[in-house]
Amino acid sequence: MEMKKKINMELKNRAPEEVTELVLDNCLCVNGEIEGLNDTFKELEFLSMANVELSSLARLPSLNKLRKLELSDNIISGGLEVLAEKCPNLTYLNLSGNKIKDLSTVEALQNLKNLKSLDLFNCEITNLEDYRESIFELLQQITYLDGFDQEDNEAPDSEEEEEDEDGDEDEEDEEEDEAGPPEGYEDEDEDEDEAGSEVGEGEEEVGLSYLMKEEIQDEEDDDDYVDEGEEEEEEEEEGPRGEKRKRDAEDDGEEDDD
């Protein structure tokens, strides 16, 4: 199957700009060049073109979001400078099983500043003396060559890398939870409780002052009542006394007439 037909089959009624991963392994490149792949695949992050008889990268479109590129088991012998121009954000590049023979060909990868992992397994260049030391010295940005770092530690799988990233995020969340709220942060519930207590104290003060005023008013009313009662008693006492004086005066007058 030709590459152009393979691409149409892999789209599965999707628009090219919706595709983030595209696997075109084992199809056929006419004249050893890329066909059917263009700039509309702008969201592409993973592209695999293994064993497609690819010999030239000249027709590779601009794929600024591409992170991983699989080009193993082809007949590429040079022209790697195109990768830095068209895929500047590559972190993983697999050129295993190609026709790469010398360090000058690989030197073009120096401009891939984000490149961390490079595979050249089964390329003639691996037969050079001090091959690994030379590649690490030439491409100082990479961490892994043919699956191992400079201390021969094996590179983690892609799935493990994703799990590690998720784990790091979880640890960060836990650390934030343990650290508590940031400085200057105040809990709304605490603010409400404080406001409620202040209101409650204010209400108690108002209630006490109101009760005190009522007691004072009651005492004043009682005093007024006592004064009024004493005046009434005095009037009652003066009333009979006055009448008695009047009668006594009348009796004295009658005696004088006699």
Swiss-Prot record:
Residues 239-249 have a biased composition (Basic and acidic residues). The keyword Nucleus applies. It is found in: Cytoplasm; Nucleus. This is Acidic leucine-rich nuclear phosphoprotein 32 family member E. Histone chaperone that specifically mediates the genome-wide removal of histone H2A.Z/H2AZ1 from the nucleosome: removes H2A.Z/H2AZ1 from its normal sites of deposition, especially from enhancer and insulator regions. Not involved in deposition of H2A.Z/H2AZ1 in the nucleosome. May stabilize the evicted H2A.Z/H2AZ1-H2B dimer, thus shifting the equilibrium towards dissociation and the off-chromatin state. Inhibits activity of protein phosphatase 2A (PP2A). Does not inhibit protein phosphatase 1. May play a role in cerebellar development and synaptogenesis. Component of a SWR1-like complex, composed of EP400, KAT5/TIP60, TRRAP, BRD8, RUVBL1, RUVBL2, ING3 and ANP32E; the complex does not contain SRCAP. Interacts with H2A.Z/H2AZ1. Interacts with the importin alpha KPNA1 and KPNA2. Phosphorylated. The phosphorylation is nuclear localization signal (NLS)-dependent. GO terms for cellular component: cytoplasm; cytoplasmic vesicle; glutamatergic synapse; nucleus; postsynaptic density membrane; postsynaptic endosome membrane; Swr1 complex; synaptic vesicle membrane. Residues 205-258 are annotated as: ZID domain. One of its GO terms (molecular function) is histone chaperone activity. The modification N-acetylmethionine is found at M1. Keywords: Acetylation, Chaperone, Chromatin regulator, Cytoplasm, Isopeptide bond, Leucine-rich repeat, Nucleus, Phosphoprotein, Repeat, Ubl conjugation. The gene is Anp32e. Pfam families: LRR_9 (PF14580). Residues 123-161 form the LRRCT domain. The H2A.Z-interacting domain (ZID) mediates a direct interaction with H2A.Z/H2AZ1. The lineage of its organism: Eukaryota, Metazoa, Chordata, Craniata, Vertebrata. There is a cross-link at K68 (Glycyl lysine isopeptide (Lys-Gly) (interchain with G-Cter in SUMO2)).
